[in-house]
Amino acid sequence: MELVTILEKTVSPDRNELEAAQKFLEQAAVENLPTFVVELSKVLANPANSQVARVAAGLQIKNPLTSRDPDVKAQYQQRWLAIDASARGEIKTYVLRTLGTESYRPSSASQCVAGIACAEITVNQWPQLIPQLVANVTDPNSTERMKESTLEAIGYICQDIDPEQLQHKSNEILTAIIQGMRKEEPSNNVRLAATNALLNSLEFTKANFDKESERHYIMQVVCEATQCPDTRVRVAALQNLVKIMSLYYQYMETYMGPALFAITVEAMKNEIDEVALQGIEFWSNVCDEEMDLAIEASEAAEQGRPPEHTSKFYAKGALQYLVPILTQTLTKQDENDDDDDWNPCKAAGVCLMLLATCCEDDIVPHVLPFIKEHIKNPDWRYRDAAVMAFGCILEGPESCQLKPLVIQAMPTLIELMKDPSVVVRDTTAWTVGRICELLPEAAINDVYLAPLLQCLIEGLGAEPRVASNVCWAFSSLAEAAYEAADVADDQEEPSSYCLSSSFEVIVQKLLETTDRPDGHQNNLRSAAYEALMEIVKNSAKDCYPAVQKTTLVIMERLQQVLQVESHIQSTSDRIQFNDLQSLLCATLQNVLRKVQHQDALQISDVVMASLLRMFQSTAGSGGVQEDALMAVSTLVEVLGAEFLKYMEAFKPFLTIGLKNYAEYQVCLAAVGLVGDLCRALQSNILPFCDEMMQFLLENLGNENVHRSVKPQILSVFGDVALAIGGEFKKYLDVVLNTLQQASQAQVDKSDYDMVDYLNELREGCIEAYTGIIQGLKGDQENVHPDVMLVQPRVEFILSFIDHIAGDEDHTDSVVACGAGLIGDLCTAFGKDVLKLVEARPMIHELLTEGRRSKTNKTKTLATWATKELRKLKNQA
């Protein structure tokens, strides 16, 4: 069968034809990829073929070159480069020849060119491509289609390739793009393709922005494009301004007054949503930049140096113009608004919040008149906008300035919780939630707390969108009430607090809310469970009877849920069922933490039975397994040594968790649980250690185990050693060799994620060494001789700490662990340590840094280690 016919059948309505065509194409790609792609490129390049065939051919060429997964993409690119150079040359010729010949948009050829370019340019191949593309755009004889598809190709290349690969070509690329963007260009399609290409190229044109004359020209062309009658070009040009503001803030002063301010403020007022959104986004970005600069300025001041970059305070200067437009935009809400639709009204709310955080007290006088004028407006849109504006400015200004305003507004807000408009009630509930979170002392006052609680309790019965915000308000209120309560010096928790009298009713109402049939809407069910967790966690002693009742309700629900499991049919039911199991597990954790030890012993059999059943039934769902492991972990915490009786029954499921490489969160939870078991069971963990140590060591050596699990495993070795003391000797050699290997890991320092990982790995190593030394040393006055087994490694351990001290990327918590380990080495090995430390002056610098830390733990450990070293010095 002819290739063209098969390609046309890839869109056939007949399922059999479609599947046969796909199967043929897949087979052809496997049998002989080079020949297959050459044939496809001929189909693509031939204008006589149908549009369907050409587009399908383009997809078949492009798809084996690109993937969203960077690892797969790299494999694809290697596979392409392995194709014989002459075949690749032929394909590239046909693909380039296609540019400008397609009568459809977007161009398939431009995507193919970009796919090949990203594979070849990175290995210094296809040097003639960029000059060829530039010529296509700048040649006066080029057609509109040629220029448009070529600029699309340039845009795709800029979007997908590592910017460093194109820096040396930035002048040529920019020449082509600016040529296509100029107002003299007759075709708006060409201008659009060029403007989109510029957006993708901004990262690597820094050298051009650094030169004043080039920068002026780029800015002129972009500003002119924002005035294009074609909305698509206008939006793309504004997107460029938004991004330029982030990347090149320091250069914008010249353009802000004469151009950018007027362009963006006009855009904000535009009737067309896409245009208005970009105008608002521009000012949101200004706020983001200026907040970063404020942080930089305060850090520089702390260190007594001038900041590298300074803020020009554009946001503060523009407040009087921006706020009226934003508050007016807040009145354009859609009554049946879907949460997922991003529109100017939502963007205006976010921009107001950012302005409040950025400009602090200065925003209040600009927003307050609007709130006062409209909070009782007969038009619901204005009432809603006023409440929204109020909620938006609660974070940023000083609380002393906001608190009197909030207290004054409280009766009105309580009244608005009963507003006829659901939109107003929703926004009011959100605003009350923000007050509870950000200015709780205004909510927890003698005058308004009772009516506020009453209206919130009633609000739990409202529409899901309102009730969901009410749940969030309860979460914040519970935490604030607990923190505001008086606690006797010798007590951990308050005997009573301001929610005590309503506690039982609130809990009862929240439990009812979790059971609402419409609980899946607006995330209501999980919001209600989270509120329940917060309120139980933050309860006073006199609320304990209600906590006991809640515990029984949650246990009963868990049992009910497990009974329904066998009747589940559909996938959507299964998802809801798993979510419910996870929520119940999380709630169970919270109530267990509050339950007194005696009560915990009475219910632990039933709890454990439910959790074991859950492990049996949820082998397929990692999320639920993780939550169930966390619940077991809490039970271990509450029961302590009494958990031993469940170990035999639980061990198989712990093993499954430790072996779950595919879902690393489950594996992480299982590893963490091993540490909890060691702390709770102490030496009673011994009979289970051989097996657990075997799995942990296997995981460390296994390529398929996610890297984030490995630092935790190292740390758990320390927990095992602390629990079993001298019995750890049998694992000592293999563990010390593993630690020696792990502590020598190197990473790419330009990759922040890897730098974080390296710090975690080092912390894990130090925690392991600490646990081993403390475990073997014993906690008696006299050091147990077993610890001398570590003596040969002491020099290596100190060199490791010295190496960390010299690495400027070390974190505060690594300093804390390192200091603790130095102190332990001193107490275990005495004067030998002193000589080794003296030979490594960086260690003293590390301890000095620790003593100056803002974190108490780090300060305490560093001071202790310094004292231990001083003791040894005095003895010597």
From Swiss-Prot:
GO cellular component assignments: cytoplasm; cytosol; nuclear envelope; nucleus
Q: Which SUPFAM superfamilies match?
A: ARM repeat (SSF48371)
Keyword Nucleus among record annotations: yes
Q: Name one GO biological process term.
A: protein import into nucleus
Q: Where is this region: IAB-binding?
A: 329-342
Alphabetically sorted, this entry's keywords are: Cytoplasm, Nucleus, Protein transport, Repeat, Transport
Which residue numbers delimit the Importin N-terminal domain?
21-101
Q: Where are the HEAT repeats?
A: 2-31, 33-65, 85-123, 129-160, 170-202, 212-247, 253-302, 314-360, 364-394, 402-438, 449-485, 500-537, 544-592, 600-639, 644-681, 686-724, 732-776, 786-829, 831-873
Q: Which Gene3D superfamilies match?
A: Leucine-rich Repeat Variant
Q: Ran-GTP binding: where is this region?
A: 334-419
Any one Gene Ontology MF annotation carried by this entry is: nuclear import signal receptor activity
Principal localisation = cytoplasm
How is this protein organized at the quaternary level? Forms a complex with an importin alpha subunit.
Annotated function: Required for nuclear protein import and mediates docking of import substrate to distinct nucleoporins.
Instruction: List the PANTHER family hit by this protein, alphabetically.
Output: IMPORTIN BETA
Give the UniProt family note.
Belongs to the importin beta family. Importin beta-1 subfamily.
Name of the molecule in the record: Importin subunit beta
* Record organism: Xenopus laevis
Which gene is this protein's source?
A: kpnb1
